[in-house]
Regions:
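Charged, terminal alpha-helix-loop-beta segments
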Residues: 1-168
Length: 168
């Protein structure tokens, strides 16, 4: 018998919502996420927001804010599943990060790509990245049935990429 998938097709927005939930309610995930890219250690959580447009410099898929001692940290997350980067997209992320620091919204800001491993390893626009595979493994190993289900959703997204998209 053929496996029945809980969802036929995963879109980037679906993964955004998984990330948004975890970054807002799962402190252990937040700590793991920032440690996996070597960001300053979290001392207080502020929150995460989806689809933030700022300064006329494009959109941030997810903006995650936390405190590291007396520093307010912004993490601008670009989630990429099966599309090419827009022209100078990473530069616009860097520009928004700099502007957030300059206008006092935060003390320090970082940009991070979240995507399937195949995508991350074949791009040169973002220096820091977290793979869908590592997120899925973390959720599977720490989140009980809920984490196993979310890992399954990420696996569906990863297989979607493998079936039809090649990052260049």
């Amino acid at each position: 018998m053929r496996e029945i998938l809980p969802i036929e097709s995963i879109k980037e927005r679906d993964i955004d919502l998984v990330l948004l939930e975890e970054l807002n309610v799962n402190h252990q995930f937040c700590e793991w996420f920032i440690q996996s890219v070597g960001l300053p250690e979290i001392t207080a959580h502020e929150g995460a927001w989806r689809s933030i447009t700022a300064y006329g410099k494009g959109e941030t898929d997810i903006l995650f804010s936390y405190h590291a001692n007396d520093e307010k940290v912004y993490v601008l997350i670009e989630n990429k599943l099966d599309a090419y980067f827009q022209h100078e997209q990473s530069k616009r992320y860097d520009s928004r990060a700099s502007t957030y620091c300059e206008d006092g919204s935060c003390t320090v800001a970082f940009t991070v790509l979240v995507a399937p491993r195949q995508y991350c390893e074949n791009q040169h626009d973002f220096e820091q990245y977290v793979t869908y595979e590592s997120i899925g493994e973390f959720l599977r190993s720490t989140g009980g049935d809920r984490g196993i289900f979310k890992n399954h959703l990420l696996d569906i997204a990863i297989h979607k990429l493998r079936r039809g998209f090649q990052a260049v």
